[in-house]
């Protein structure tokens, strides 16, 4: 925010430090001064100060910043004069304001002023505004901008005659403060027409019964006034509004509209509702000075939850404060500092009873008070000292160690780790075949940055597949993986899972299975097996996998993930030209099963013999079924069976596929003769042919 040096000086008794020195002090004790420049023919200096979000509620104003400067420089603060509001009798129809929700509008205050004069502002106020980048328009509009920049409370002025309703009747006029409906239109003071999102705060007027006129939106509350009620040179009566609006609602609306104002930026950080009347009293005091004149004929003040905005009391233990700061601290010095920040302090034995002003929303516990004391004293004045504490080795984080091992294993296999957003959007539902039930289990983001980030991801695979889609033209094969959290609804609760997913573009089921075996072996998991894929809604979605080329990964009956090829439907939707193999593992379950114990098997000193076998089986037959039959028939002398080819296509009967295996025979205590190997191999052939649907090809 831009601050005028001359303007700040008005609220300080005594001379401020030179502009450069003041900037240095603010940098050391409060906020970063991002820029310092001269303005207005070198009569003033402008400080561009980066007010931190946790102090925006009280320091996005010249009086707020002056209060900080007074505390830092040990100077006295002199606040601007206000004027007690006096209501006089007038001829205007009274105003009634209805607020839809006190959560959305904690306080609504306004002054109805009759008989104002619209004209040019005095030179001094025009110069003040222009110094900080605000154009002077007329005395009423300049008043609202000046009060906002001085006090931190945004104001807005309505032309009261432009608010629909009876003008001079006892019935009065009516304004409603409510949430907008989706798509409602409003034209703002700067001639922009907005189609409003649902939930935006708006103010509408209410024409008199029988007038035939519809209700109109006259204000985008907290952000920008409506054009229909704008102040003009012919304005005679004004409604001067100072309200307190819900910070989250204003922030969401300005983000959705991609439109903001200085008032909206202030409201979006939440401010003290008690500021509204203070700002109106200050505005009333300036009306005569700015030539506005007029008389107040009505005060509106809706503040139903005023009790919840009372001052807070915090007990500060002096011994605690000294130990945190690392310096001896007297009660007297602590009291002086806190009082300079507008706190009220009462001394007790070894404690301070501190009453914090309502504007300081950031002061909630004694640690906050210690921080305030520390920064005003100056962190640079606190002597550096080495911490005195026993040096103990950190505890072993088993989860991180196993995760590092998994990452290294995948990188060793040629995979690249990627990091994606934790979101998916509406456009992902169709290509990834989300059903209505799938969508219900997604976690919707309340305030998404865009439609592309409308939901939290329920799987890592979708974004990985989009990575493949965007990079497939650059290379023949892609190997990527991601570690991250997924989110879903299950039985009325939010479930968050830590997952690992890997993709091989131009890869097959068996290639991915080999990767999975390598990872599991590296984690000491030897009891893994693969079962027919039967995805449940809380674990994965069947629609993303290729039916017949996917499997569940199990360890001792515990499901730990899925692997297989991505369905042709998804490939077509994403325009992927090659098949994609995928692996999806639950890291939490996987790490619980991992073991550092590695069993060592002495390799045989005797040579092995290899035989090949080709078997014609029905298309739906699982490879594991055939391998189990061969292992059972061969006994302990069958050291390994590997599938090296699977053929489906021409020259085979319909509904059939050909499986080709290497069978390795080996003994640990002797060299097997050819006759022994042939006998074992024939046993396996016989066992296979016992199944009438299987045929050994010779």
Language model regions located:
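Class II aminoacyl-tRNA synthetase-like tRNA-binding/catalytic domains
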Residues: 176-207, 215-231, 381, 388-496, ...
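His/Asp/Glu-rich mid-to-C-terminal helical/loop segments that flank catalytic regions of hydrolases
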Residues: 273-290, 461, 467-478, 678-684
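A carboxyl-terminal module marker
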Residues: 2-3, 340-349, 493-495, 506, ...
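Glycine-rich, charged/polar anion/phosphate-binding loops
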Residues: 96-99, 186-190, 223-228, 266, ...
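RNA/tRNA-interacting regions in translation and RNA-turnover enzymes
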Residues: 1-379, 383-399, 404, 506, ...
């Amino acid at each position: 925010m831009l601050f005028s040096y001359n303007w700040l000086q008005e609220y300080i008794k005594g001379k401020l430090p030179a502009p450069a020195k003041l900037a240095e002090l603010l940098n050391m004790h409060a906020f970063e001064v991002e820029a310092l420049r001269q303005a207005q023919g070198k009569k003033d200096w402008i400080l561009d100060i980066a007010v931190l979000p946790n102090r925006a509620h009280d320091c996005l104003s010249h009086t707020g910043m002056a209060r900080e400067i007074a505390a830092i420089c040990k100077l006295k603060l002199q606040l601007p004069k206000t004027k007690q509001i006096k209501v006089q009798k007038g001829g205007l129809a009274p105003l009634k304001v209805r607020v839809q929700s006190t959560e959305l509008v904690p306080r609504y205050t306004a002054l109805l002023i009759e008989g104002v004069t619209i004209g040019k502002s005095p030179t001094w106020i025009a110069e003040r505004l222009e110094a900080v980048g605000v154009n002077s328009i007329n005395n009423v509009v300049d008043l609202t901008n000046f009060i906002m920049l001085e006090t931190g409370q945004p104001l807005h002025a309505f032309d009261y005659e432009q608010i629909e309703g009876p003008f001079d009747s006892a019935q009065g006029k009516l304004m409603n403060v409510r949430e907008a409906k989706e798509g409602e239109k409003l034209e703002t003071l700067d001639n922009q027409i907005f189609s409003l999102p649902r939930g935006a705060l708006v103010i509408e007027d209410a024409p008199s019964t029988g007038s035939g006129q519809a209700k109109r939106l006259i204000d985008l509350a907290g952000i920008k006034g409506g054009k229909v009620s704008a102040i003009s040179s012919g304005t005679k009566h004004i409604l001067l509004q100072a309200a307190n609006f819900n910070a989250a609602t204003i922030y969401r609306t300005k983000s959705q509209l991609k439109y903001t104002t200085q008032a909206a930026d202030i409201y979006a950080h939440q401010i003290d509702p008690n500021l509204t009347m203070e700002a109106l009293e200050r505005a009333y005091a300036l009306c005569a000075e700015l030539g506005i004149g007029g008389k107040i004929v009505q005060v509106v003040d809706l503040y139903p939850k005023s009790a919840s905005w009372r001052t807070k009391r915090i007990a500060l233990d002096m011994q605690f404060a000294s130990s945190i700061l690392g310096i001896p601290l007297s009660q007297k010095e602590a009291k002086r500092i806190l009082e300079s920040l507008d706190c009220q302090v009462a001394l007790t034995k070894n404690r301070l009873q501190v009453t914090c002003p309502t504007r300081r929303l950031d002061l909630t516990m004694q640690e906050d008070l210690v921080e305030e004391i520390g920064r005003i004293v100056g962190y640079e004045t606190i002597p550096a000292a080495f911490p005195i504490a026993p040096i103990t080795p950190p505890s072993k984080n088993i989860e991180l160690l196993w995760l590092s091992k998994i990452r290294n294993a995948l990188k060793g296999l040629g995979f690249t780790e990627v990091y994606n957003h934790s979101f998916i959007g509406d456009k992902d539902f169709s290509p990834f075949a989300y059903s209505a039930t799938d969508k219900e289990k997604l976690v919707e983001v309340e305030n998404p940055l865009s439609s592309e980030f409308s939901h939290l991801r329920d799987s890592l695979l979708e974004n990985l597949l989009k990575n493949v889609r965007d990079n497939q033209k650059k290379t023949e094969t892609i190997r990527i993986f991601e570690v991250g959290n997924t989110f879903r609804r299950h039985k009325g609760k939010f479930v968050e899972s830590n997952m690992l997913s890997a993709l091989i573009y131009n890869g097959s089921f068996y290639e991915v299975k080999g990767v999975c075996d390598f990872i599991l072996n590296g984690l000491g998991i030897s009891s893994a097996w693969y079962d027919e894929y039967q995805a449940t809604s809380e674990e994965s979605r069947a629609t993303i996998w290729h039916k017949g080329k996917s499997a569940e990964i199990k360890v001792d009956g515990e499901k730990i993930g899925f692997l297989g090829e991505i369905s042709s439907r998804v490939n077509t939707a994403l325009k992927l030209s090659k098949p994609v193999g995928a692996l999806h593992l639950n890291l939490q379950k996987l790490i619980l099963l991992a073991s550092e114990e590695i069993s060592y098997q002495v390799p045989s000193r005797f040579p092995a013999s290899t035989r090949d076998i080709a078997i014609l089986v029905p298309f739906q037959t699982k490879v594991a079924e055939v391998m189990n039959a061969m292992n059972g028939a061969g006994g302990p002398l069958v050291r390994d069976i590997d599938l090296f080819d699977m053929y489906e296509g021409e020259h085979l009967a319909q509904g059939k596929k050909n499986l080709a295996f290497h069978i390795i025979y080996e003994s640990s205590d002797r060299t097997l003769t050819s006759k022994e190997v042939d006998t074992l191999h024939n046993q396996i052939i016989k066992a296979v042919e016992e199944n009438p649907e299987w045929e050994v090809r010779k």
